[in-house]
Amino acid sequence: MIPEIGQFALVLALTLALAQCVLPVAGAARGNAAWMAVARPAAQGQFVFVAIAFGCLAWSFVANDFSVLNVATNSNSQLPLHYRVAATWGSHEGSLLLWVLVLTIWSVGVTVFSRHLPDDVVARVLGVMGFISVGFLSFMLFTSNPFDRLLPPAPDGRDLNPLLQDPGMVFHPPLLYMGYVGFSVAFSFAIAALLAGRLDATWARWSRPWTTVAWVFLTLGIALGSFWAYYELGWGGWWFWDPVENASFMPWLVGTALVHSLAVTEKRGGFKAWTVLLAILAFALSLLGTFLVRSGVLTSVHAFATDPKRGIFILAFLAVVVGGALALFAWRAQRVSTGGGFDLVSRESLLLTNNVLLLAAAGSVMLGTLYPLALDALGIGKLSVGPPYFETVFVPLMAPALFLMGVGPIARWKKAALPELALRLRWALAVAVVTALIVPLAMGRFSALAGFGILLAAWIIASSAATLADRVKGSGGAAGIVSRLRGTPRAYYGMLLAHVGIAVFVVGVTLVKSYESEKDVRMAPGDTVELGGYVFRFEGVRDTQGPNYVAARATLTVTQDGRAVATLRPERRLYRVQESPMTEAAIDYGFFRHIYVALAEPVGADAWLVRVHYKPFVSWIWGGCLLMALGGLLAASDRRYRIGARERQPAAYAAEPGAAR
């Protein structure tokens, strides 16, 4: 009965989604207030029914209802409770339901936090989001029903993929989906602006906080996925340029460009058409990621094995949404004024250059991801594109972008002078150069890669400090400086914090890439190996077991200069149901380094192959991501998006001349 309730709730949600996508948009076109008023209750009702369906599926997993095919395929009676809950979104069908649930959460957010917006704007935005819901609910009900019955019921389930039986995977998909799907709000605002014929600063102000919050979630989701791969897969790597990793990274790159472009459109009225195009592309790449994961064209630890017909459905939906959006853009954008002009050297030109570099970087990642798939689909042959391609193409595009990141915030709008910029940033450049010389030498060996990476990171931090100092210059003493700092918008501090986060990330990537070391060694009880100034002693292996697995657990003691540092216990697990061997690494976490040990396989009566790693500054990679996310949250919480906008923006919108309805 519970699965049938969930199924019926999805049907009702689809009905409301149809009403949400048709009536409000038609009402906005006709000026019919009653039809426009349908948008909010339809979106809220849709959320209620999708949440009921999600709860029914979660209950089926928790209750071990193996008469549901989804549960029988992705769970087991021995699976711990928290992983049974996480198994709700561990399958293709369940994760698709999570996708729709997240979409309805964003829709409800629009209904709650956009009460100050004109009714026709909200109607169009929610109408577009309703259309997206119709597509995914239809896809789920007709090709990927999470409540399909299995009769007679299975005596037990096949178990959840052991790779997913990890706390990181409990939180990684929801965070990632909140980012993926969050770009649908910016997309919907852009389409609403195109439909209304009002591509002005107003729509940019309305959509900017939504875009920033979505970017924050996507940043956290990607970072958590990277950290999960680092400690769970046993390879010691934090990014593999896996096609599905790339599928989440591409919208992040374009979303980063969109966040900056929205700022220019809001503050200066420029980049109007460009910003709309970025909003379309960011969500298009989110849909592309959905296609890659669910179409069956990929082999990946992230991908779902699915029926190719599902891929055709998603591809058709992708073509309709993106093709329709681009056609509307081509029709409307030519009527939009370009905004005020600006010189070749100005903050606008620097931001535009950075946008182009980010878009080119996303394009290079897309080429490396899709080109092998296209060759395979055309029967030309199989080709593997690995890290050497991505690092060779991606890094040269990002280096100038990182340099411009230090110049842009201090440059003047409209027109800036190079001599003036050089004068204001001379100390930042000096600090960056000195730091780039000192840090590699302090690491014990000079590396050109390390020096270049530290130069860029130190440049970003020093120029951010110079930008803040320039802002308070001439404030008239300590009291004036404090007053100026208090009056500075949160969005400004959020920008600086996010930029510092990128610098910290670059430090982590540069130093771990330049100075990490690893060894694969055969170790028996009593054997030792030295790495990175640490001595690892293999004490032996004993058998242990968990709720649904058995494991061989090794013990290694780590010392430095005769002083005990850590005791590490890596495991080699065998999950009983699927007979899947898994490596559980043991890590001693430190602010400046990680000591990483993985137990590979037995190579004798008492001997094992052991992989040991010394990774300096690797934690700064994820620390930088956290700082980026905190900067985004700080920017999104700017009071300008809550106070004053309620009175100013609708009035400005209503006063806009020549708007098409």
Residue ranges and their predicted role:
Residues 25-31, 108-117, 188-199, 259-266, ...:
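Structural signal for the C-terminal ends of transmembrane alpha-helices
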Residues 174, 181-191, 202-261, 274, ...:
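Extended, hydrophobic alpha-helical segments in both membrane/secreted and soluble proteins
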Residues 51-126, 141-162, 222-266, 289-312, ...:
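Membrane-interface helix-loop-helix modules in multi-pass inner-membrane proteins
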Residues 519-611:
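Soluble non-transmembrane domains of integral membrane proteins
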Residues 11-25, 32, 95-226, 234:
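A conserved hydrophobic secondary-structure block that centers on an alpha-helix together
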Residues 86-87, 161-166, 592-620, 624:
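Short, aromatic-rich amphipathic segments at membrane interfaces
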Residues 1-34, 52, 66, 243-253, ...:
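Contiguous transmembrane helix-bundle modules in multi-pass membrane proteins
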Residues 29-50, 112-133, 195-216, 241, ...:
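Membrane-interfacial loop-to-helix junctions in multi-pass inner-membrane proteins
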